[in-house]
Amino acid sequence: MRNTVLKAVAIAVALSPAIGLAQSKATSATYITDEEVKAVNATPGVDRTIRVVDIGPENYAVGVIHRGASNAAGRGAGTGAGAGAGAGAGAGAARGAGGGAAAGAGGGAGRGGAQQGEPCGEQSTAPTTGGTPGMIAHDQQTEGYLIISGGGTLVTGGKIVNGRKSPPESEVTKVLNGPSCSGTAVGGDVVKKVVKTGDIIIIPAGVPHGWTDIGDHVDYLSFRPSARVLEAGYVNPALKK
């Protein structure tokens, strides 16, 4: 557990180098316990924000994500990545999305329901071949991942073609990642890398990302600093009981 805490601190420093230099009015620390992470991760769904904190120059969110095995039934009623990623409906839909079916499809899986947003990414009338479906890119939200259990293949890079924006009132936009674009990613700079417990990944805002080839499962913490993209003060309902 000590190593996990140290890695989490390292991610925070890497993602927010300006914290120590900015004129911040934040004067207290926020503690998220191992028990709280487990309590949130035990709830149905895939991607769940734990807390969003005002740290002065920006807001800082921490989430926990569970993805089940690729092409296997998981928690909830699995919708598949293309539907979940490209949509981003309300909280109930997101929490009901299946971890397993969503896992094999990509980063946007489980982050929404069936509502379609506006077009985004590169628009093309030509058929998209050889791309990775179910990818998502966040307009202003950088993410740092710390894999805490399991593993799989993380896909990053490229550009999204014929994507869909997350609707303004969706959970993706308001609670998880801010405005985002989901769809199939293509390009010679797409990277597919197997990641495992203990690995750290930093994904800058605007970089498409998603998952494939998850064996049993992958669980990870997501550290999300941003310039007021998410509303400070949010606390996951599982911690209010």
At which residue positions do the language-model features occur?
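A short hydrophobic beta-strand segment most commonly corresponding to one strand
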Residues: D216-Y234
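Conserved metal-binding segment of the jelly-roll/cupin
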Residues: V194-I214
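Bacterial N-terminal signal peptides that target proteins for export
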Residues: M1-V9
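His/acidic/aromatic-lined binding-pocket segments of jelly-roll/cupin-type domains
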Residues: G134-A137, E143-L146, K192-K193, I200-I201
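Short, conserved beta-strand element in jelly-roll/cupin
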Residues: H138-G158, E169-S182
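Bacterial N-terminal signal peptides
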Residues: A8-G20
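A short, N-terminal "cap"/entry segment at the start of jelly-roll beta-barrel domains
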Residues: G20-A137, G233-K241
